[in-house]
Amino acid sequence: MLKNKFIYGLIGKEIDYSFSRKYFNQKFKNEGLINNSYENFDCKNLSQAIKVLKQKNLKGLNVTIPYKEKIIPYLDTISKEAKDIMAVNTISFNNQGKLIGHNTDCHGFQKSLFENINKKTKNALILGTGGASKAIRYVLKENSIKYQTVSRKKNKGDFIYTELDRDIMSNFELIINTTPLGTYPNTEKCPDINFDHITKDHILFDLIYNPIKTSFLNNGKIKGAKIANGYNMLIYQAEKSWSIWNEIN
């Protein structure tokens, strides 16, 4: 039996699709970290998720929907970014056994975003107002990029989809999809925008990474827009989680 086995894992619901388990277990193999393993903790409800926090040999956890916000009251403290965003996607354990919540989505998005835009980008349109949009709004605000949001319901966003005419769309260089529309296996789905209003002056960013090119991105590319998916964001947030778990600056 291996000594000092360290367990990492992902807390979420219906997470068979998980990128994280495959990514980290391959990382452990590549780096010869034979005492490390990364597991999926598929929790049907919050009480199951809380039980995971008490397991032995846990070195670090990631958290995904629907527990990014619900898990917060059960942690001992959270980082400034997590507090501002009010969502946690990474949990570390200090030497005293305290549970500390972090948000590495903001790090991943910021690093990936600035690979795809220039410093002149000043206006963004965010499709979706759910939990996934929280870290996005935080990053845009921190970088002085003005944004407005689109929702299916008027009272939740600045616009509803039917209001997005050519004049409105021309005001935003950057359009970010934070909805799950287009995620595998429902790849034919797409946010309800008129792609005739998309031009070569637009940048379309989709948080989805599977498939690599969603209907949203494909329709944008046809109109000449620059496109980017969420894969690099995922890599960057995962590596940030790893550095937090191992206290790497």
Q: Where does each model-flagged region fall?
A:
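Short helix-loop-beta connector
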Residues: 117-123, 198-200
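Glycine-rich Rossmann-fold phosphate-binding loop(s) that bind the pyrophosphate
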Residues: 13, 128-130
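NAD(P)-binding Rossmann-fold cofactor-contacting core
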Residues: 142-159
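Phosphate/diphosphate ligand-binding glycine-rich loop within oxidoreductases
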Residues: 2-116, 219
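Rossmann-like adenosine-cofactor binding region
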Residues: 157-228
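N-terminal Rossmann-fold NAD(P) dinucleotide-binding loop
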Residues: 133-134, 213
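Active-site capping/gating segments
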Residues: 111-112, 226-248
